[in-house]
Each structure stands twice: as C-alpha cells, then as structure tokens.
Amino acid sequence: MPLDFNEIRQLLTTIAQTDIAEVTLKSDDFELTVRKAVGVNNSVVPVVTAPLSGVVGSGLPSAIPIVAHAAPSPSPEPGTSRAADHAVTSSGSQPGAKIIDQKLAEVASPMVGTFYRAPAPGEAVFVEVGDRIRQGQTVCIIEAMKLMNEIEADVSGQVIEILVQNGEPVEYNQPLMRIKPD
C-alpha cells in the first residue's frame, strides 16, 4: 500500500521532532529511508524496532516494519568550545551567513537534504576552496524531496573551507562552507 504525501510529511515531521537519526520503511512495492546528519562521527546506535503504527499513529499501514536509530549527542572536539552554536546569524534565526568569529562567515543549509557541489554529475563545481565569490552567487545545491534548491552566498568574499562532501546528507542550519568576507 503506497504512502500518500500527507503520510510522508507526517512521518518526516515526527522524525524531525525526535532524536531518531534514521528510519527505513519497507513494503512489497517500495522502500523509503530517511536519514538525518548526526554529528562529527556520523555513528548511530540502534534503539527500537517496532510496527509503524506504534510510532506515527493510525494514518499509516501497520504492516510496514520500521527501524529507528537514535542520534548520539554530538560532543565538541577536544580544545574547541561550543561558541559557534551561539553565534548570531545575519538574518535572525534563519539559516544563511552565520558569523562564526570576526573574520569568517558560514553558509548554512536552509533545509534538510543532500548536498551537491555541482549542478549535475560530471559538470564543474560551483565553487572551490580559494575562489572569490559575490553575494547572491550560487555556491551549491541542496536536493530535498527530488527538488534541486540552489544555495546562494549571503556575503561576498573568499571560500576558506567546504565542510561537507558531495552527496552527503545535511541537516537544517548545518554549516556547509566558511567564507572570509570582503
């Protein structure tokens, strides 16, 4: 029995509000896997295997098994502080250019999805480390629900570091790259 859009949306909302890092739904006709980025080491710990109806509610078929994994609490790297977690963003609580210190800004993911450095496989990447970029320039793509969303730089400057590998899943507001503003 295929899921409709509202059932998938309800499932994604439920997952986003928990510490579940990965969910896989399987039936005869399809398989759906949802993963969240879970920190520096990207390890997950299995927690529960239960029928789907016990996790989400009565809107989904109960014959589909669900496997859930808890996301570990991210621990800071030795010698670093969590100050970047409390940095002020340039547009309130919206993702975008986050000033991580007086010299660097971060481009953050505005959504959960998959990070891509190029517009298509085999094509040139949008930016490389060391490139000079301008405000509004496309720096990457985040694929979310089969839609390609171009992510633009909120500041002009030089790309100092790209924090995510091509094809990796990203979380909402996850830093993607660091820029030294002009």
UniProtKB/Swiss-Prot annotation:
Pathway: Lipid metabolism; fatty acid biosynthesis
Alphabetical GO biological process terms: fatty acid biosynthetic process
Keyword match Oxidoreductase: no
InterPro entries: ACC_Biotin_Carrier (IPR053217), AcCoA_biotinCC (IPR001249), Biotin_BS (IPR001882), Biotin_lipoyl (IPR000089), Single_hybrid_motif (IPR011053)
The UniProt record lists the keyword Repeat: no
Keywords: Biotin, Fatty acid biosynthesis, Fatty acid metabolism, Lipid biosynthesis, Lipid metabolism
Entry protein name: Biotin carboxyl carrier protein of acetyl-CoA carboxylase
